[in-house]
Structure formats: C-alpha cells, structure tokens
C-alpha cells in the first residue's frame, strides 16, 4: 500500500487556514485517515498528511498542511504558503466571529501565496444546524464576490468532506493540465506534427512554464 502511495502523476500542496477551533485538523484527519477526534486539542508543531485520488485516469497526490496552531498567535509564516496551489479557508458555521475573520485570512493568503492559488471557502460543523450563526446564502455570496468556490462540511459526520477536497484537487488539476497543453502547443514548431495549435500570448509564456514547474516540483 505504501509503495502505491509513492506512485503519482501530480503532487499538489494544499493548505488549511482559518481561526483556531474551526475544525481544520479534523477535516484533515477525516479526509486522509477517515478519523475524527472529539477531544482534539489545537495542533502543535507542523502537521501535514497525504492522500491520493484519481482524476481523469491520473493519480493526484495531495499534501495537505495544517496550520500547527500558529493562527492563535497570528504568526503563520510565508513558508507555510510557499508552493501551495490550493487553500481551504475554513470557518465555523456556529461562530460568526470565525466567519468575520475570513476576510483577514483571505488578505493574508493573497499577500503571501501564489497569485493563481485555488481557494475554497469552507463552512465547517454543518451538523450544528440548531446553532447556525452564518447563513449559507451570505457565505455563498461572499465566495462568489471574491471568486472562491464554496461548500459546507461536517468533519464530525463526514458530510461533504470528500467532495471539498476532491473538488479543489480536480480544479487545480484542470488548471495545471490546461497549462501543459498550452505550453506544449505553443512550443511545438516542428512541421508535419498533427497537433492542434493553441495560441498563447508570448508575454505570458514564460510565466506559465514557471508556474507549472512550481506545481510539479513541490
């Protein structure tokens, strides 16, 4: 099993961000190990876990990073964001303050992460319906306004946890594979090859190659 896990076509680093106590560690453990710990304390030390999924016949290995409790001190370092191609920005649907802080997290993410990082807004603890403090429509509207995807999850009862991670990984894969097609077509100048030409503006060519390399070589 371990050997199979080492075989993959793409490796994507995805970070979990958001206030302390919103359930980031349990989202991570639910997706990667199908575990949930009611007694879970704030994460201490750097923690990441991996899991591979299949998309279009390709093996995508996700390396998912948890904030290691640094968010309590507002001390997440730029190293945490380095190389990340995806981010799950998590709040607790039963605590409005964690949702209010989403804007600050989004700003920090955009200040430190790659410009093209794929971001998903995640309203966690959807099992606490009777305590809901953040209306779904309000969060969805915020996500649309800021070009984020959006989903509500429950790490406790597993609702939408698989979907959240698979959706963001699939979106990242689509972007990366499109760039590969664009790059190959733009650089293929050999006559007689039966390749559909996809025009890529010369000014962005170099940038595209660099970003792709970043994604592949994490």
UniProtKB/Swiss-Prot annotation:
Residue numbers covered by motif Switch 2: 67-86
- Binding sites annotated in the UniProt record for GTP: 20-21, 23-26, 37-38, 40, 42-43, 69, 124-125, 127, 155-156
- Enzyme Commission code(s) on record: 3.6.5.2
Chief subcellular location equals: membrane
**Short sequence motif Switch 1: positions:** 36-47
Q: Which GO terms describe its cellular component?
A: phagocytic vesicle; phagocytic vesicle membrane; recycling endosome membrane; synaptic vesicle; synaptic vesicle membrane
What does the record say about activity regulation?
Regulated by guanine nucleotide exchange factors (GEFs) which promote the exchange of bound GDP for free GTP. Regulated by GTPase activating proteins (GAPs) which increase the GTP hydrolysis activity. Inhibited by GDP dissociation inhibitors (GDIs) which prevent Rab-GDP dissociation.
Residues annotated with N-acetylglycine modification? 2
Bias kind Polar residues: ranges? 201-218
Q: Which residues carry this modification: Cysteine methyl ester?
A: 215
What's the protein called, per UniProt?
Ras-related protein Rab-11B
The organism encoding this protein is Diplobatis ommata
């Amino acid at each position: 099993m371990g050997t199979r896990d080492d075989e993959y076509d793409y490796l994507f680093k995805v970070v979990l961000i958001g206030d302390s106590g919103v359930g980031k560690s349990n989202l991570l453990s639910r997706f990667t190990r199908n575990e949930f710990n009611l007694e879970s304390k704030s994460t201490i030390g750097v923690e990441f876990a991996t899991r591979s999924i299949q998309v279009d016949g390709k093996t995508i290995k996700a390396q998912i990073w948890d904030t290691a409790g640094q968010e309590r001190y507002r001390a997440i370092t730029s190293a945490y964001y380095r190389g990340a191609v995806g981010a799950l920005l998590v709040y607790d649907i039963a605590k409005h303050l964690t949702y209010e802080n989403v804007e600050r997290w989004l700003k920090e993410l955009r200040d430190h992460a790659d410009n093209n990082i794929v971001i998903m807004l995640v309203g966690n603890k959807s099992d606490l319906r009777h305590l809901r403090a953040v209306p779904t429509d309000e969060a969805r509207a915020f996500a649309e306004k800021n070009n984020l995807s959006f989903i509500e999850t429950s790490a406790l009862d597993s609702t939408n946890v698989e979907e959240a991670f698979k959706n963001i990984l699939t979106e990242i894969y689509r972007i990366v594979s499109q760039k590969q097609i664009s790059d190959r077509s733009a650089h293929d100048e050999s006559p007689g090859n039966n390749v559909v030409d996809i025009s890529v503006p010369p000014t962005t060519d170099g940038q595209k190659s660099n970003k792709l390399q970043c994604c592949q070589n994490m």
